[in-house]
UniProtKB/Swiss-Prot annotation:
<keyword id="KW-0469">Meiosis</keyword>
<dbReference type="GO" id="GO:0008278">
    <property type="term" value="C:cohesin complex"/>
</dbReference>
<feature type="domain" description="SCD">
    <location>
        <begin position="278"/>
        <end position="365"/>
    </location>
</feature>
<dbReference type="GO" id="GO:0000793">
    <property type="term" value="C:condensed chromosome"/>
</dbReference>
<dbReference type="GO" id="GO:0031619">
    <property type="term" value="P:homologous chromosome orientation in meiotic metaphase I"/>
</dbReference>
<dbReference type="InterPro" id="IPR013721">
    <property type="entry name" value="STAG"/>
</dbReference>
<dbReference type="GO" id="GO:0000785">
    <property type="term" value="C:chromatin"/>
</dbReference>
<dbReference type="InterPro" id="IPR020839">
    <property type="entry name" value="SCD"/>
</dbReference>
<dbReference type="GO" id="GO:0005634">
    <property type="term" value="C:nucleus"/>
</dbReference>
<dbReference type="GO" id="GO:0010789">
    <property type="term" value="P:meiotic sister chromatid cohesion involved in meiosis I"/>
</dbReference>
<dbReference type="Pfam" id="PF08514">
    <property type="entry name" value="STAG"/>
</dbReference>
<protein>
    <recommendedName>
        <fullName>Meiotic recombination protein rec11</fullName>
    </recommendedName>
</protein>
<dbReference type="InterPro" id="IPR011989">
    <property type="entry name" value="ARM-like"/>
</dbReference>
<dbReference type="Pfam" id="PF21581">
    <property type="entry name" value="SCD"/>
</dbReference>
<dbReference type="GO" id="GO:0030999">
    <property type="term" value="P:linear element assembly"/>
</dbReference>
<dbReference type="InterPro" id="IPR016024">
    <property type="entry name" value="ARM-type_fold"/>
</dbReference>
<dbReference type="GO" id="GO:0007062">
    <property type="term" value="P:sister chromatid cohesion"/>
</dbReference>
Length: 923
């Protein structure tokens, strides 16, 4: 925003504006006039005092005595210039009551108003750092105020040695703060006295003050402008406070007409200050001056909402929302918050129009501003919901705040979304029930539904839809993942159909950041605790399982209860975190809580097989539903009374494992099978079925390896990369690898292992692509680790032979520089950590000596830098689109070996830690 520098009232100062280009006042040191040594022609060598820097802003008794001697050095009689030293000292004297101080100066004002006004104006000048000061003649010559101020300013600030930045209204010293506070309170007492004693005296004081201070607010010198604006704001606060007190008295006294007349005068003065100073300086180029103005407006609004809340104030508050200074945006929001509940009746329509106009800007602040401002904006939005309806675009933006780091912000957001959901339901019912009741409409459906059930389904689906929009927007902004966006007139619609947002890439992005997962968990907890609609795991599951809709009936009243694909997949994430929360609660003591947790876990066991069956086509939903199973305790999972549900669950997970092509789901299903295999309570038929899964996978893989080798030998030139046969082989290798990684250490070496190892070694000796070679080596390596557990080392030579062949054939490939490094380093670390008795040959030891390993590590780090350079150019991909093989290999690398998929390849400690954990776990 570009701010207006000067108002029309400062046109007489145009001749000195050009001097600002050569003197930047905020970058030069200014030392204010000393309270001890004041001279019109102050020498640079004379002692000067900074506010709150080198010396304390106070005078000892000796210094007061020296003041008499100092005044003799002045070039002009003290009758002509009045330095407000006594005024400063009395303001500093905290032992002197303000009432006594105001009474003292009130008596002076009555006896000689000219001298008091001279002291008051000189106080404003010295507070600005000006010297020399003005005389009695200058004060009374109102018509020459602009020229007089111009001369004083030029004399004070012409030389850099006479310019400073630490002055009364910016100093943080204790003395300066005392003067500022007591001066403001002094004004309240003084103005009250002069008007109560004689209104004419008050008007005379205010007219002279306004003539000088108003002109000072248009000075081209920031120090003067800031001080004068602050004094005007102080006077305005005083007037508001006095009017506030008079309003209370007017209800308790018979002199109502007199008080009303006095109140009317004060109100006119307040509006005069607003129009002449605040509404002009609120657009000043200096943020400090704008802050003073907007703070004063907020303070005065609270004191006199009836008189001050008007269109001008509302309009300027709206402009403040786009100010570059965060404090101004924050205070402007507070003003809007206050006026939304205190606006006069005559301005209600204008306020509603204003809130509707600036609602988008407010919700943008909720989402994108700094933390302290966002908190105020969200509270303001809560008030907005009482006055206006936020449109779809605003709700989409504010819904992202449910994933804010501050709990209070999440609570405010949830209140806004729940209020919007209730409003949406009310509007829908009003539109549908214009001619017929809702209960009759529901009875017309194919399967009738109660009004209460319809309301619950409608609101749950509507709220989950809003939360999903917010989650998608927040997730995209907080990660490197890029999704297409379509702009609509009233809302942003983010394409979230299958294979777009919620896909395998989404799961990869979702799992790789522990900090973000923790924030999602906290946000889901806020959703659960602040919404009665989503407080039950079973109720949300019923929404997903409800299938009594007629999809062909586009006019059905139940259509808003049908969850979209995106809502279903987001709901699966929510149910996973809900299940985690239930699991954590089970560890807390308390019989009542324990019964509640058991009931919810039983509901999970009953509903999860149905959810997996209905949504098995969605990899994301299946992934999170299976993760929910991990939160069901073994003692419940294997109970005989739930054997039927458990058998259905096992069957559904097995079907997903057999049909899926997504690596994440293969790994998750394999972990489930491993959990069953290591538990002695599981029935024999289940264990036998798991054993058959391993044998079936091994047999199928062996057949595919045979067919691939035969096909390769027939057509040596064709590498078969990219065709269906190669893709099917890689899928089979990955599926067996996922299962073997979890199960192979529980099994003894059998014939299938030996047959597979021979075929895999043969694959590596052929001219195959890097993905096939990588997948083959990975499976062979898993068999090798299983073999090392029994210290048989049957596969050691086979693996080393295959690894060396792969290195020779792919010496400069991504595979050689990354995978060989990992496998060899794992063997090296594993043999050191677990005392594996492996008879390595001389060539093997040479391949695995420390120098060779360090060289490979450096190569790996170099590739890591290449990865970072590529990913920085296009954050949607880990590698550029044309490097498809490298991208796939890189992703497989982290999915297979890195703990928590922690993608920081430049950190060697992550690599070593992951390898060490893998070796320890599988040994």
């Amino acid at each position: 925003m570009r701010f207006e520098f000067e108002s029309d009232a400062s046109s007489h100062l145009n001749e000195v504006l050009t001097e600002l280009e050569s003197v930047e006042l905020e970058n030069v040191e200014y030392e204010g006039p000393s309270l001890q040594n004041v001279s019109i022609c102050a020498s640079p060598s004379e002692k000067k005092r900074k506010w709150g820097t080198q010396d304390e802003f106070s005078l000892t008794e000796n210094e007061e005595n020296n003041e008499i001697e100092t005044n003799e050095e002045m070039h002009v009689n003290s009758h002509d210039y009045a330095f407000p030293q006594e005024f400063f000292l009395k303001l500093l004297d905290i032992d002197m009551p303000l009432e006594q101080l105001s009474q003292h100066y009130f008596e002076d004002y009555k006896s000689n108003s000219a001298d008091f006004m001279l002291t008051f104006i000189n106080f404003a000048l010295v507070a600005s750092g000006c010297q020399p000061f003005v005389t009695n003649f200058d004060v009374q010559d109102v018509d020459s105020i602009p020229e007089t101020l111009s001369q004083v300013n030029r004399s004070s600030f012409q030389k850099s040695s006479c310019a400073y930045t630490d002055y009364l209204y910016t100093s943080n010293s204790k003395e300066a703060k005392t003067v500022r506070i007591r001066f403001q309170l002094f004004l309240v007492e003084f103005i009250s006295k002069v008007y109560v004693e004689d209104a004419f005296l008050g008007d005379s004081f205010m007219e002279t003050t306004k003539a000088w201070i108003f002109t000072m607010t248009t000075s081209p010198w920031m120090l003067v402008r800031h001080t004068a604006t602050t004094i005007c704001c102080d006077i305005m606060r005083c007037l508001c406070l006095i009017v506030n007190k008079l309003s209370e008295k007017s209800n308790q006294t018979a002199e109502i007409l007199v008080l009303r007349d006095l109140t009317s005068r004060f109100i006119d003065m307040i509006h005069d200050i607003c129009d002449s100073v605040l509404f002009s300086r609120i657009h000043d180029i200096r943020a400090s001056i704008r802050i003073v103005c907007v703070t004063a407006l907020y303070d005065c609004c609270q004191l006199l909402p009836t008189y001050l809340i008007n269109r001008n104030l509302i309009r300027h508050s709206g402009w403040g929302l786009s100010d570059a200074e965060s404090q101004i945006r924050k205070i402007s929001l507070k003003i809007i918050d206050y006026l939304s509940s205190h606006e006069p009746e005559k301005d209600q329509d204008f306020v509603v129009d204003f809130l509707d106009r600036f609602s988008l800007r407010i919700v943008e602040i909720c989402r994108y501003d700094i933390d302290s401002v966002r908190s105020v904006a969200l509270k303001t939005c809560e008030k907005l919901m009482e006055k206006i309806s936020l449109n779809g675009k605003c709700i989409n933006i504010v819904s992202s705040c449910i994933f804010d780091g501050k709990p209070q912000n999440r609570i405010s957001t949830m209140r806004i979304l729940v209020a919007h959901t209730n409003e949406r339901y009310a509007n829908y019912c009003e539109a549908k029930t214009a001619t017929i009741s809702l209960s009759k409409l529901l009875r017309r459906e194919k399967i009738p539904l109660l009004v209460s059930s319809f309301e619950s389904l409608f609101k749950m689906n509507a709220l989950l839809f809003i939360l999903e929009q917010g989650f998608e927007s927040w997730f995209r902004d907080s990660s490197d993942h890029i999704f297409s966006r379509v702009k609509d007139d009233d809302k942003f619609v983010y394409q979230s159909q299958e294979n777009n947002f919620y896909d395998a890439d989404f799961i990869r992005e979702y799992d790789m950041n522990n900090h973000r997962q923790q924030l999602i968990e906290e946000s889901m907890h806020s959703i659960h605790t602040n919404s009665q609609l989503l407080a039950s795991w079973e109720d949300v599951a019923k929404l997903l399982l409800y299938d009594r809709f007629d999809a062909k009936d586009t006019n059905s009243v139940l259509n808003p209860c049908i969850p979209s694909n995106a809502v279903i997949e987001f709901s699966s994430i929510y149910l996973h975190y809900f299940a985690t929360h239930i699991s954590k609660r089970s560890k807390k003591p308390g019989k009542r809580l324990e019964d509640e947790v058991v009931n919810q876990q039983q509901a999970m066991l009953r509903n999860l097989p149905l959810l997996l069956q209905k949504y098995r086509e969605s990899c994301v939903s299946s992934y999170f539903f299976i993760k929910c199973v991990e939160q069901i305790p073994d003692e419940l999972l294997y109970k005989r009374e739930f054997h039927k549900d458990f058998s259905k669950l096992y069957k559904e997970i097995l079907d997903i494992f057999n049909s899926t092509t997504v690596n994440f789901l293969m790994i998750l299903c394999s972990r489930f099978f491993h959990r069953l295999a290591v538990n002695k309570v599981v029935q024999e038929d289940i264990l036998f079925a798991i054993d058959n899964v391993y044998n079936d996978l091994a047999e199928s893989l062996h057949e595919q390896l045979n067919a691939y080798i035969q096909r390769k030998k027939i057509n040596k030139k064709n590498q078969l990369n990219g065709n269906d046969e190669t893709q099917n082989l890689v899928l089979a290798l990955n599926k067996f690898g996922c299962f073997a990684k979890e199960m192979v250490c529980l099994r003894d070496v059998n014939d299938w292992n030996i047959k597979l190892s021979e075929k895999l070694c043969e694959i590596c000796s052929l001219e195959v692509g890097p993905i096939v070679c990588y997948s083959s080596l990975k499976v062979l390596f898993l068999l090798l680790l299983s073999d090392m557990r029994d210290r048989n080392c049957i596969f050691t030579n086979i693996f080393l032979k295959a690894a060396k062949v792969a290195k020779q054939k792919n010496g400069n490939s991504f595979l050689s520089k990354v995978f060989i490094t990992i496998t060899m380093l794992t063997l090296f670390l594993g043999s050191k950590a677990n005392n594996w008795d492996i008879n390595f040959s001389d060539d093997d030891l040479k391949l695995m000596n420390e120098e060779e390993i360090m060289e490979q590590i450096e190569t790996f780090k170099a590739w890591s830098m290449k990865f970072k350079e590529k990913s920085s150019g296009n954050p949607s991909y880990f590698f550029s689109p044309e490097d498809t093989e490298e991208k796939e290999l890189w992703n497989n690398l982290f999915e297979d070996w890195y703990p928590n998929r922690a993608r920081d390849p430049g950190t060697l400690s992550h690599l070593v830690k992951g390898l060490k954990e893998t070796a320890d776990h599988l040994s």
